[in-house]
Amino acid sequence: MSEYTISQVYPTDKTVLAQIDTLLGQEGIRRDGNLDYICAMFDEEYNVIGTGSCFGNTLRCFAVSSAYQGEGLLNQIITHLIEVQCARGNMHLFLYTKVKSSKFFGDLGFYEIARVEDTLVFMENRRDGFGAYLRDLEKTRTEGKSAALVMNANPFTLGHQYLVEKAAAACDTLHLFVVSEDASLVPFAVRRKLVEAGVAHLPNVVLHDSGPYIISNATFPSYFLKDEAAVIDGHARLDLAVFTKIAAALNITARYVGEEPTSQVTGLYNQIMCEQLPKAGIECVVVPRKEANGKAISASTVRQCLQSGDWDTLETLLPKTSLDYFRSPEAEPVLARIRNAGNVVHY
């Protein structure tokens, strides 16, 4: 087997990045918008013949030149990326791949979590990772009607609280999943704390971390899906494939979502969810958004108000628990991050 050089490619290296983009294009994929490490494999004349990337705890954007396939180069690239991740302290790794490539990654020690037929497979490098997560969830399984809510809560608003109250009133147990990945302006630890405080008056709400299995639009890999509509569709269907397994573990028969009058992405996501969930015996319940000042309450408006210091408006958008936090010295690092963020609407 030939030994070729593998090295990191930096954002400033436009020449090599252009070669990587060409190579990815030949494989029918493109460079993902979310990457924090890119490597390239070079031949003796410093031409790019292979590439792979990381983002957070995921591996992404693999390709090997067709002239070099069959030499085991992709194995070397994956091994290199796993070493990079280990050096970062990321031992539990994930990847998304085309269905036809899943067996290859299975041979490298990755195990299927869920799949969207003919589109993609979500995999991890732990044989029992998702299984252990489901068994952990099962400890909170209850009799009676169980429902679910999944929210980012970036941050927790009166709108979120209203949605939780509506859902909790309609079931015996409400399983509330907070998206745990830190792709939001408000860090996960703070988001979870504000959700916990904001639902403390509801005794039938069970709070869960989504773990690495439910991810947001912000970090879903788009590199092998042809356009934005396909990305939204792929993400929604994968999320639902994962959620259906979670629902089975917890005896969940309904999922609640907030109506989405402004975000096209979330609106399409909700539409797919309402089409697909009933096929798995799960009711999809869309709850009209709570309004303030004649407009639907949204976390993006809250972030804008936090950025500009508009506390009068914030008093109409946040529950007391969230408001008290943002007025406390503890919130200063988060507020500084929001003030320095530029555009906070789509964050």
Give residue ranges: language-model regions.
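Conserved beta-strand in the GNAT
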Residues: 40, 46-63
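Conserved GNAT acetyl-CoA-binding A-motif
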Residues: 85-98
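Short amphipathic alpha-helix that is part of the acyltransferase structural core
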Residues: 1-31, 42, 47
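Short coil/loop residues immediately preceding or within conserved phosphate-binding loops
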Residues: 36, 59, 144
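RNA-binding accessory domains that recognize and position tRNA/RNA substrates
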Residues: 30-31, 65-68, 83, 88, ...
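Nucleotidyltransferase catalytic core that binds NTPs
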Residues: 97-98, 102-110, 114-347
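Structural motif
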Residues: 35, 55, 116-117
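Conserved acetyl-CoA pyrophosphate-binding loop and the N-cap/start of the following alpha-helix
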Residues: 68, 72-80, 159
